[in-house]
Amino acid sequence: GDLPVPRTRKDLLDPRYRDRIVLFGKDRTEISNATFLYIYKEFGMDGIRSLARNVKHALHGAQMSRMAGSANTEGGAVYLVSWFFAKTCVKPNVEIVWPEDGCMTLPMYLLVRKDRLEAVRDIVDYFVGVEFAAACSRAFFPAANAAGGGLLPPGAKLAWLGWDYLRSPD
């Protein structure tokens, strides 16, 4: 249609997208908080309210991948989905957009008890190593070791909330 393609997080707040955005979540009512953290940091509560008006509902990434570009009335015009699920949506009328202000990232944690580190050293080394990073990259998932990656689109940026922000009491 005549709806412009959003290129930044700020674009998602525009009233023209009212009830047209589908976010990643467990189901139609349980939405991942990741997007809201970024919107709140950049645009405050006004940004949260604007985004909330524009969100139709949430779907799992696999559902979004199947629904995007279809005539299904449960779908939306814009889907915020992980790169993996975006890459599985190969349809001529769907455009995958890497945000100009960077793709939102969230850290994954590998927690190991200090007294057990040596017992599981091989496993830890594998998960932070080049081989696992390369496998993640081939599956369009970020990895802990940049040396094994390299499959991001040219000029792709990543957005990161920052530890200081996440640790702040607000």
Feature annotation, model-predicted:
Residues G1, T105-A119, A135-A139, A144:
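A bilobed periplasmic-binding-protein/Venus flytrap-type ligand-binding module shared by bacterial periplasmic
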Residues G1-L23:
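A conserved helix-loop-strand patch within extracytoplasmic ligand-binding domains
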Residues D2-R7, Y40-G47, D115-V120:
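Short helix-loop capping/hinge motifs at secondary-structure junctions, enriched
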Residues K10-L13, F36, Y40, V120-V128, ...:
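Non-transmembrane alpha-helical segments in soluble domains
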Residues R20-F24, E30-D101:
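Ligand-binding pocket segment of bilobal, Venus flytrap-like solute-binding proteins
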Residues R20-K26, F127-L151:
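Periplasmic-binding protein-like
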Residues G44-G47, G129, G162:
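Glycine-centered helix-coil hinge/cap
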Residues L151-D170:
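Extracellular/periplasmic bilobal clamshell ligand-binding domains
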